[in-house]
Regions:
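Conserved alpha/beta cores of soluble small-molecule-handling proteins
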Residues: 2-122
Length: 122
């Protein structure tokens, strides 16, 4: 599967912005079946968030969507830098260290047997 620079008549060329062909990721592989919530791995249908959660009450949230190809996170260091910067901008403390976040990402990839898809951090 080849990465191609995104470029069409309506947008300027940005060498750091890429897209995958439409058939590269199917909906089935993009949806996780095992999630990580509040320190626990669980089936997605068991995941719950407290009604007192600040993100739920006030909409405070930072997220990153990380691409997985052949079971590997693509440009994960870039995602982690942006995550760190974004958390700092809104004064939210990271619940885990960056090394722990990477461990969770890798465990989610393994638990979901994810070859191609997405890992969504929020």
């Amino acid at each position: 599967m080849a990465w191609k620079p995104r470029r069409d008549a309506t947008e300027a060329f940005d060498p750091l912005c890429y897209y995958l062909p439409p058939d590269a990721i199917s909906i089935e592989t993009a949806i996780s079946r095992v999630v990580y919530v509040n320190g626990c791995y669980m089936p997605e249908d068991e995941a719950q968030i407290s009604i007192f959660d600040r993100g739920f009450l006030f909409g405070d949230a930072i997220y990153e969507v990380c691409l997985v190809i052949r079971g590997q996170l693509i440009d994960n260091q870039g995602h982690l830098r942006r995550l760190t910067r974004s958390l700092g901008e809104v004064d939210i403390e990271a619940p885990l260290s960056m090394d722990e976040i990477v461990s969770v990402q890798r465990e989610l990839i393994a638990k979901n047997d994810l070859d191609e898809g997405l890992v969504y951090l929020q």
